[in-house]
Design a protein with these regions (language model features):
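Conserved glycine-rich cofactor-binding loop
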Residues: 19-20
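The beta1-alpha1 cofactor-binding region of Rossmann-like NAD(H)/NADP(H)-dependent oxidoreductases
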Residues: 44, 65-77, 109
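Substrate-binding pocket helix/loop in short-chain dehydrogenase/reductase
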Residues: 102-104, 108-116, 207, 211
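Active-site helix of classical SDR
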Residues: 127, 163, 171
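Alpha-helical segment proximal to the catalytic Tyr-Lys
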Residues: 132, 176-180, 239
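Residue(s) in the substrate-gating loop at a strand-loop-helix junction
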Residues: 147
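C-terminal substrate-recognition "lid" of short-chain dehydrogenase/reductases
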Residues: 219-248
């Protein structure tokens, strides 16, 4: 039985990047606890597959195609999410991309725009649209999925680190902007998790060793280990929490 404090029963939550990795873990866990989940990502087929699995297990899920980097299409995304169950109670800005560039000089404008578009521009627009929709039904909660790269940047991920640092600033600013309409905005600063996006180095013993060396727990995270933070921030357990960044990284000094 779900603790009433962390109850998300019947809450409508839109999760971007929801069809795989951390997003899929979030969608599955939220649905298991009674939330009505909108699984959104660029590949509709992948969203449909996860939504079908959630539904078969007794949960409620709806697939939705969503290109977070496409500013003009995002209004339609929020409208579509609201249309499914008549409201929107939660948004998880989880979609992201973190390609490694050889150097800042060799980072093309196209790559720069893609990284900033998915990691900052899209969440900015979605936050504004979702907060407006939430305000119409009494408020809600927005969770921005950031990265340790935003506070511990490395040379090979300069643009990604800068975009995620911008996302942290967006979290603080919008928490202030939307507090008066009952919308809370918080962030999760994630360490490295074992997902398809990190398979390239998690599967390489030498690279993996270098990644976990500064981590207190000496390992990468499992996708299900993000669930507790998300449940806290989307539920009434966090009604006095806004503008905060919660670090989930296995402990880094």
């Amino acid at each position: 039985m779900t603790d009433p404090l962390f109850d998300v029963t019947d809450r409508v939550v839109l999760v971007t990047g929801g069809s795989r990795g951390l997003g899929a873990a979030m969608c599955t866990a939220l649905a298991q606890r009674g939330a009505r989940v909108v699984v959104a990502s660029r590949k509709l087929a992948a969203c449909e597959e996860l939504a079908a699995r959630i539904t078969a297990a007794g949960g409620q899920a709806h697939p939705l195609a969503c290109h977070v980097g496409d500013w003009e299409s995002l209004e339609g995304v929020v409208e579509a999410a609201v249309a499914v169950w008549g409201r929107l109670d939660g948004l998880v800005n989880n979609a992201g991309m973190s390609p490694v560039a050889p150097s800042l000089l060799e980072t093309t404008e196209t790559l720069f725009d893609k990284i900033v578009g998915v990691n900052l521009k899209g969440p900015t627009r979605l936050t504004a649209l979702a907060a407006t929709a939430m305000a119409r039904t009494g408020g809600g909660s927005i969770v921005n999925v950031s990265s340790v790269a935003s506070v511990r940047p490395t040379p090979l991920t300069t643009t990604y680190s800068a975009a995620k640092a911008g996302l942290n600033a967006l979290t603080a600013a919008t928490a202030m902007e939307y507090a008066n309409v009952g919308v809370r905005v918080n962030g999760i600063v994630c360490g490295v998790f074992d997902t398809d996006a990190t398979a390239g180095f998690v599967g390489d013993p030498e690279l993996l060793a270098s990644v976990v060396r500064p981590v207190a727990l000496q390992r990468v995270g499992r996708p299900d280990e993000i669930v507790g933070a998300v449940l806290y921030l989307l539920s009434d357990a966090s009604t006095y929490t806004t503008g905060s960044l919660m670090t989930v990284d296995g402990g880094r000094g």
